[in-house]
């Protein structure tokens, strides 16, 4: 009974925390307004003598004023525009493929191929958003008075983003296949659990990317604090199930998704209770497939280590 109460409380905290972005956005804007504004120096007419001294190194030209950064809201609107743009591109591809295959009386095949195109589009959007969201992430950190995350090499950031995105695709497939389970009353609950947890994975990935948390560490966090993440992802899961039209639900997701990413920064998912929350390995299947793909890619990727290459050749 105590464990059930703890699970319910953690779910409640996650659900409530998912709406913190409403006040947090205002806090970010207030913090942005407090930033020191550097006024550019007044232009001074340069004489021939000043230019001659600049060449000789006697007189140095004053430094250029720092470029003004894009505002938080401008970056946010850019991400909104990109999300909608990717969705429109996806729909155009579906229409073109459907029209092309209609000449062979295989319109459905064209549409199905178009739906599969969401996978490469999803990968592209994740990479671009990871780059664009860095400024928003910095604004969130400053509003929370947190130290900036350590600088991560681009290659490491890209690898982590791709692995995480691949795992999310497998987890999405796992959730979609679960709707075919022959359990009438329980099957919808299982599907909902997958979608809510998947939404939390999407939202918290950007925060975890900033701190360069490994994929295994993220997996352990989600499986150890699953009631919280279940509650956090519930509002987005409910909003994206309003319509039976996949495109409409995708538009709703694209509009709400950046807001919930911002909300993940002030969220407190690591609460302590009287007893530990039972860990559920709901990522086991998707993790297994992600690991298999990772090993396959590693096996076909040429190594730069001559010793390792020599050992592989001898074996």
UniProtKB/Swiss-Prot annotation:
- Tell me which tissues or organs this protein is expressed in: Expressed in pharyngeal and body wall muscles and intestine cells.
Alphabetized, the UniProt keywords read: Autophagy, Cytoplasm, Membrane, Transmembrane, Transmembrane helix
Query: Can you name a GO cellular component term?
Result: membrane
Q: Where is the signal peptide?
A: none
Q: Which residues span the membrane?
A: 84-104, 113-133, 146-166, 190-210, 221-241, 242-262
UniProt xrefs under PANTHER family: ETOPOSIDE-INDUCED PROTEIN 2.4 HOMOLOG, P53 INDUCED PROTEIN
Q: What is this protein called?
A: Ectopic P granules protein 4
Look up and give the organism this protein is from. Caenorhabditis elegans
């Amino acid at each position: 009974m105590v464990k059930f109460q703890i699970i319910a409380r953690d779910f409640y905290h996650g659900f409530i925390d998912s709406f913190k972005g409403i006040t947090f956005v205002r806090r970010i804007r207030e913090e942005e307004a407090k930033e020191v504004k550097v006024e550019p120096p007044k232009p001074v007419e340069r004489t021939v003598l000043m230019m001659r001294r600049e060449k000789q190194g006697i007189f140095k030209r004053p430094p250029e004023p720092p470029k003004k950064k894009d505002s938080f809201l401008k970056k946010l609107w850019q991400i909104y525009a990109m999300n909608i743009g990717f969705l429109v591109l996806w729909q155009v591809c579906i229409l073109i493929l459907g029209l092309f295959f209609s000449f062979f009386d295989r319109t459905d095949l064209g549409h199905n191929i178009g739906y599969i195109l969401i996978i490469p589009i999803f990968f592209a959007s994740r990479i671009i958003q990871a780059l664009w969201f860095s400024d928003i992430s910095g604004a969130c950190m400053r509003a929370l008075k947190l130290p900036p995350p350590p600088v991560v090499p681009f290659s490491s950031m890209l690898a982590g983003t791709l692995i995480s995105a691949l795992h999310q695709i497998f987890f999405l497939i796992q959730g979609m296949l679960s709707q075919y389970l022959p359990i009438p009353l329980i099957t919808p609950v299982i599907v909902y659990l997958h979608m809510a947890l998947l939404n939390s994975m999407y939202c918290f990935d950007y925060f975890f990317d900033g701190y360069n948390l490994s994929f295994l560490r993220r997996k352990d966090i989600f499986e150890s604090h699953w009631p919280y993440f279940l509650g956090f992802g519930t509002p987005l899961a409910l909003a994206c199930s309003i319509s039976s039209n996949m495109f409409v639900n995708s538009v709703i997701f694209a509009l709400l998704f950046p807001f919930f990413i911002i909300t993940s920064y002030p969220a407190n998912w690591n609460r302590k209770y009287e007893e530990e929350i039972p860990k559920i390995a709901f990522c086991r299947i998707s993790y297994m497939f992600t690991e298999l793909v990772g090993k396959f890619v590693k096996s076909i990727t040429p190594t730069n280590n001559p010793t390792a290459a020599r050992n592989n050749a001898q074996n």
